[in-house]
C-alpha cells in the first residue's frame, strides 16, 4: 500500500484543497509529473493543464490550473496556482475568453520575449481546451 502525503492546491482567491493523497499528477513545465510520498524535493513551474488528485479516501478529483508553481517535499506538495477551478465547474466560454484575452495582449506586445511567452500560453490554453471539452 502506498504511503499518503499532504497536498494543498491554493489559488489567490482561496484554498481549494488540503488533504491526504496517494498521488497527484501535475502539469509541470517539463511535462506531466506524478508526485507521491517521499518524492525528492523539487520546485517546478506549472503550465496550464489538469491536476489529477487521487485522495487517500479513494476519491479522484481533477482541477484545471492556469499556471503557477509547485513546491514538492518528501512529506507533501503545495501547488500555488495563478488560477484554479474544479474541472466540472469549468465553463468552455471562460476558457475561450482567456484565449481571446491572451491573443489581444499578444497583438499589443512589443518585446520578443513577451510575445514568445504569450504564444506559448495561447498554445497551452488551446491544447487544454481541446483536451477537456465535454461531450
Swiss-Prot record:
Intracellular or extracellular location(s): Cell inner membrane
User: Which Pfam family name is an example for this entry?
Assistant: ATP-synt_DE_N
Q: What is its main location?
A: membrane
Q: Which UniProt keywords apply?
A: ATP synthesis, Cell inner membrane, Cell membrane, CF(1), Hydrogen ion transport, Ion transport, Membrane, Transport
Q: Cross-referenced InterPro entries, in alphabetical order? A: ATP_synth_F1_dsu/esu, ATP_synth_F1_dsu/esu_N, ATPsynth_dsu/esu_N
| Database matches in CDD domains | F1-ATPase_delta
UniProt GO MF annotations: ATP binding; proton-transporting ATP synthase activity, rotational mechanism
Keyword Transcription on entry:
no
Q: Name one GO cellular component term.
A: plasma membrane
- Membrane topology per the record? Peripheral membrane protein
Its family remark reads: Belongs to the ATPase epsilon chain family.
What assembly does the database describe for this protein? Answer: F-type ATPases have 2 components, CF(1) - the catalytic core - and CF(0) - the membrane proton channel. CF(1) has five subunits: alpha(3), beta(3), gamma(1), delta(1), epsilon(1). CF(0) has three main subunits: a, b and c.
What is this protein's function per UniProt?
Produces ATP from ADP in the presence of a proton gradient across the membrane.
Query: What's this protein's name?
Result: ATP synthase epsilon chain
Question: From which organism does this entry originate?
Answer: Rhizobium rhizogenes (strain K84 / ATCC BAA-868) (Agrobacterium radiobacter)
Gene name of this polypeptide:
atpC
Amino acid at each position: 500500500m502506498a504511503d499518503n502525503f499532504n497536498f494543498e492546491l491554493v489559488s489567490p482567491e482561496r484554498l481549494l484543497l488540503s488533504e491526504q493523497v496517494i498521488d497527484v499528477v501535475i502539469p509541470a513545465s517539463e511535462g506531466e509529473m506524478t508526485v507521491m510520498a517521499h518524492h525528492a524535493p523539487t520546485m517546478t513551474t506549472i503550465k496550464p493543464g489538469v491536476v489529477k488528485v487521487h485522495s487517500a479516501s479513494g476519491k479522484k478529483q481533477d482541477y484545471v490550473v492556469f499556471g503557477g508553481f509547485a513546491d514538492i517535499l518528501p512529506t507533501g506538495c503545495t501547488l500555488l496556482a495563478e488560477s484554479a477551478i474544479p474541472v466540472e465547474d469549468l465553463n468552455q466560454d471562460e476558457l475561450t475568453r482567456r484565449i481571446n484575452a491572451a491573443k489581444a495582449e499578444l497583438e499589443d506586445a512589443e518585446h520578443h520575449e513577451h510575445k514568445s511567452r504569450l504564444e506559448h500560453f495561447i498554445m497551452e490554453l488551446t491544447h487544454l481546451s481541446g483536451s477537456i471539452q465535454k461531450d
